[in-house]
Regions:
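Alpha-helix N-cap/loop-to-helix initiation residues
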Residues: 66-67, 93, 154-158, 282
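Conserved residues at the C-terminal ends of beta-strands
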Residues: 29, 60, 110, 179, ...
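Flexible mid-to-C-terminal extensions adjoining Fe-S/redox cofactors in radical SAM and related proteins
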Residues: 1-6, 29, 247-258, 265-323
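Conserved alpha-helical substructure of the radical SAM core
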Residues: 1-99, 103-106, 204, 208
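Radical SAM enzyme [4Fe-4S]-AdoMet core and its adjacent flexible, acidic
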Residues: 14, 32, 37, 80, ...
Length: 323
């Protein structure tokens, strides 16, 4: 792969720095700044977005729906035939149901398990009920509107993936995907990687890994071929193997991924990363998007990156293999 990027089909924008949940596996909620990507700032980069042939923008977080003018941003992008997806906690879906249905292409909500487990992990009383009400409000407006779920596996929900899939189906969601919790990187607003005691609060013991493996095998047995669970058997096995690697029982193995060559992550303060987990390659506060993704630092990074042997890639829980 060349180190020079001529097209960037996927752009992940974090329009707002804060979040309205307090999840045990994430530190974004600790952010106190009001940083957000303004419409004026986005306007400055629209020409580069078009030149890079961006096809899909994903609004990630923090919680995108906390942005003061999110639907203006989405309108600017959709006017250029760019698909816009929101990753959301689900707490604000009901409030913005009409705007979502008319101005966002699809939504992916966080779903951590059945109601009591979801609320415990989110540390927001009634979070599941608000998610359920939001999904219903959107589907009342458009029964075919696509809302998928993503479940992050960790110590508080490792024993209930099968039940989580059933909950997602009962909610009327379109699909569900699973990933392992990241416990080693400085992503998700960690000022430094977690110490061992903090990792142990989220990662699994060996007995828990075996329980998780059986659960994921049940998910594959019950839902294989349905199209409802995004991961196949191999990808589900990678989740339990990720926790085995954390225990030192197997070698951590990087997934197939081309994220640094086909995507970029722009944080609310303008910081640009090649993916969620690798260090920044520049900032939109001082350069244009095109200057950053094809700047010296970015090209040096991509030119030297061997995904298969890179230790950060080996720990990755959220890869992208764009075709």
């Amino acid at each position: 792969m060349t180190s020079l990027i001529r097209s960037l089909p996927v752009l992940i924008l974090c329009p707002h720095a804060r979040c309205n949940c307090r999840c045990v596996m994430c530190d974004i909620w600790k952010e106190t700044s009001q940083s957000e990507l303004t419409a004026e700032e986005l306007t400055q980069h629209l020409a580069d977005i078009e030149e890079l042939s961006v096809k899909w923008v994903v609004f990630s977080g923090g919680e995108p729906l906390m942005h003061s003018d999110l639907f203006r941003l989405s309108g600017m992008l959709r006017a250029r035939d760019i698909r816009v997806t929101i990753l959301s906690t689900g707490l604000l879906l009901k409030r913005y149901a009409h705007q979502i249905v008319t101005r966002i292409d699809d939504v992916i909500v966080s779903l951590d398990g059945p109601a009591h487990i979801h609320d415990q992990i989110r540390r927001v009383p009634g979070a599941f009920a608000q998610l359920e009400q939001g999904v219903r409000a959107i589907h009342d407006l458009n029964p075919d509107y696509r809302i998928a779920a993503r479940c992050t596996i960790q110590r508080m929900n490792y024993a209930c993936p099968s039940e989580t899939v059933r909950v997602a189906r009962r909610l009327g969601l379109s699909a569900i995907s699973f990933l392992a919790a990241d416990v080693t990187s400085d992503a998700f607003n960690r000022f430094q990687p977690w110490e061992a005691y903090r990792q142990a609060q989220v990662a699994l013991t060996l007995d828990e890994v075996w329980t998780l493996q059986r659960e994921l095998e049940n998910v594959d047995r019950d839902w294989d071929g349905s199209g409802f669970v995004a991961e196949n058997a191999e990808k589900l096995r990678r989740i339990s193997d990720h926790f085995r690697a954390h225990l030192g029982l197997v070698r951590a193995q990087a997934p197939r991924c081309n994220a640094p060559w086909v995507s970029a992550v722009v944080e609310a303060n303008g910081t640009v990363r090649p993916c969620f987990f690798h260090p920044p390659i520049g900032s939109l506060k001082s350069h244009t998007l095109l200057q950053v993704v094809n700047g010296f630092e970015a090209q040096q990074f991509r030119g030297a990156l061997d995904v298969a042997s890179n230790p950060v890639c080996a720990q990755c829980v959220c890869s992208l293999n764009w075709r």
